[in-house]
Structures are given as C-alpha cells and as structure tokens.
C-alpha cells in the first residue's frame, strides 16, 4: 500500500494508473488486478485504516461523559491521526475521487460525530466557523513543509493547543465545586 500511497501523493489518485502502481511495486499489472479489482479498491485499502481510526476516535470520545472530555478525546485522536498520516491526510482532503469515496464510506457518520463534538450541541455561527477552521487548519498544518522541522511531539502539542483555543467549550470555566478548571495542554 505504501507504493500506491507514494504515487497518489505525487500524482493524485486520478493521475495514478494501475500500471504505475505495478511498476513501482516491481510486479505485473495482472498481479495488481489479482489483488485489487479496481483502483477504488486500492484507494479504499490505502485510506481504510485511517477511516477505521476515525471511528475508534469517535467511539472513544463518545464514552466520555462531559462535553469537555469528549472534545479533548476527539481532538487528541484527530491530531494523532494527522501526525501519523501526513501524506494520506492531503490525499483524503484534496483528491476529488478520494473525497467521493469517503463521503460514501460508513465512517462518514464518525466524521459527523466528531464535527458535532467540535461544534457542541446547537452550535452558533462562531462554533461552526471555529470547527471549520480547526478541521481545515489541522489538515494544512499536517502537510505544511514549513513544519517538517518540528518533532511529532512538538507538532502535536502546538496543534492541540491552537485547536483547543478555537474550540474550547463555551461553558462556564468554573467547575461544579467553584474552582477553576485547568485548561488541557495536549494529552489526556
């Protein structure tokens, strides 16, 4: 799958032929066809693990009782996913064929659940804009070559902290006992 990902990243899905994948892998086109019947099958094999992770992120966040904890959990999971899949993130976000496959994939409901965690219940315009900016910003930061010099942990911390400032729950910042609630710093 790395061979296909390399080619998708360089040429886009539409610009990558099965013959190119076969050549890159050092096998025949027939061997690729034997394993995968269509290019869509290859794309789904490449993006499938990340989509499964999205579902796990949404499920883990849903298990949290408080909205703030759900938001932290979802944001940590998304940041980790982006850092681990930088090349894939760009393909999923910007390739029209991949975007179409993602829209039709069962994990789409998980994406919507995470978006709901980012916006909160009954979101106003500010919450919707914040969620859109965070979603797009996380993707762009994950593929920005200017950030290649940052370690994964440093990038993780900055992505989480910056996104948190935009998404912070719009609930009171005092706990039920009257004390201040500590702001998260990137890991739960």
Give the residues covered by each predicted segment.
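Short alpha-helical functional segments enriched in proximate histidine and acidic residues
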Residues: 7, 81, 166
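Hydrophobic alpha-helical connector segments
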Residues: 41, 45, 56-90
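Helix-turn-helix
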Residues: 3, 7-41, 45
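Short amphipathic alpha-helical/adjacent loop interface patches that line ligand
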Residues: 36, 51, 75
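Hydrophobic/aromatic-rich alpha-helical bundle segments in the mid-to-C-terminal region
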Residues: 69, 89-90, 94, 100-188
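Solvent-exposed, amphipathic alpha-helical segments
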Residues: 3, 7-10, 53-60, 137-141
